[in-house]
Amino acid sequence: MIEAAVTADAPATGPASARTLPALTQSKPARFATIMVLYFLQGVPFGLTTVALTAWLSAQGATPVEIGAFVGFALLPWSTKLFNGLLMDRFTFKPMGRRRSWILSAQFLMIAALLAMAFLAPTANDIMTLSALCFALSLCATFNDVAVDGMAVDIVPSDERTAINSVMFASQFAGIAATSAIAGSLLMAGDLRVTALVLAGIVLIATVFVSLFCERPGERLMPWSKGEASPECLKRQRSAFWPIISGVFRSLFKRHVLLLLAGMACIQSSDAFADAVAPTLGVQHLGWTSEAYSNFGAMISLVIAGAILVLPAPLKMWLGPRMAVIVPVVMAALTAAAASFTFPYWQGSNEFVLVEALMRILSWVAAIGLISWTMQICNPAIAATQFALFMAMNNFARSGYASVSGWVVEAGGYPAAYFAVSGWLVVGLVLIWLARVGDETLVTNHDD
């Protein structure tokens, strides 16, 4: 099992010893707070793109095919995270740590993308420009995401992994909820410019907070500050691409890893439904306003945040790591199948709310267990690339499902979309079972 390079509460040395704020490796509260804030910010592009803007576009008459294409293109950068990881494992400004310079740069690029959105302020009729702006925002956010994931694998002790995974994604869903509610209300007033400016302000405030903590004692807070590269950074940072690529491919071409990748990709069908199909179902079929759907998305995100904060650890303890993943996936597949067969008899919104909540909560409880497992099988020296590969496959599947979901709806209606989700979840279930998730004999000790 991977062990963190340092332990919490280690004594400060060097230039950082005079600072009042601890390094992330020294303080568990600092680690958790920083990672929570960074993951909260990852909720900004997701909440804006997959909830607020999709509801807004649906209210303006966009078809399921157009919504699916918009979401698929806007989320596409999340499937390219492998290349981000390669860059980060190869290049960094070492005096600021392995990941911090990338994180702060990504935050400022997110602000720039939101300011560009505010300046251009495309209307709902200019869906191509809106898609391009959301693509740019997602691209900036992926650098932040990969850097944070790599930092988590790098500095979080193994006994904190399950807890930190729950906190990470609970924070992301809190960010999605906040963004959905704020952006939904502002877009209802018809002002994309103000929406983008408000979100840019939120990202800026969070960036200031994150900039207060260095990764390890003695490192620089800013490029112009005093400090030097830590021994851990110098030891782990690669000086060439080939060792990174060869290490990733050695870890990839194993039966259980390939099965795990395919299974995780199949489970993403549930999120893709929420991204691309649910907005038109709620706004156009059920007659909700765009603000009502955005508020619903915010509420569901908060419920998911609470569920993944509370449920994964006890489920893992009671059921074991494998069944803690299998059971939620089985329940999600049954929920989607039931929705498919009962959809013609739905009398209003209650059935949609219940089904959407159950499918998303169950799929994400399973996802937390899977992500925790992938962190265990990652090598810290190439963590950004290796972990990014797992997440890139997930996000590519999510983007792909979203892109074609509109065609499924137009060909067979919403029951067909629910049935497709159920089918993909069953396939994912079989693959996850064959991948032997939770089998400790598959975890390799990594030498840095």
For each of these PLM feature ranges, what is it?
Residues V51-E66, I267, A276-Y293:
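Short amphipathic helix-loop junctions that connect adjacent transmembrane helices
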Residues L76-T80, Y293-M317, P328, A332-T335:
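Transmembrane alpha-helices of Major Facilitator/SLC transporters
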Residues S105-I111, V194-L212, A416-L434:
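Symmetry-related core transmembrane helices of the 12-TM Major Facilitator Superfamily/SLC fold
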Residues M323-L370:
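C-terminal transmembrane helical hairpin of 12-TM major facilitator-type secondary transporters
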Residues I103-A124, V330-Q347:
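C-terminal ends and interior cores of transmembrane alpha-helices
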Residues T80-G97, L187, A307-R322, V409-E410:
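Helix-to-loop junctions at the C-terminal end of transmembrane segments
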Residues W78-K81, T162-A181, M393-A402:
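Glycine-rich segments within core transmembrane alpha-helices of 12-TM secondary carriers
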Residues A12-P29, G218-L260:
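Juxtamembrane intracellular "pre-TM" segments in multi-pass secondary transporters
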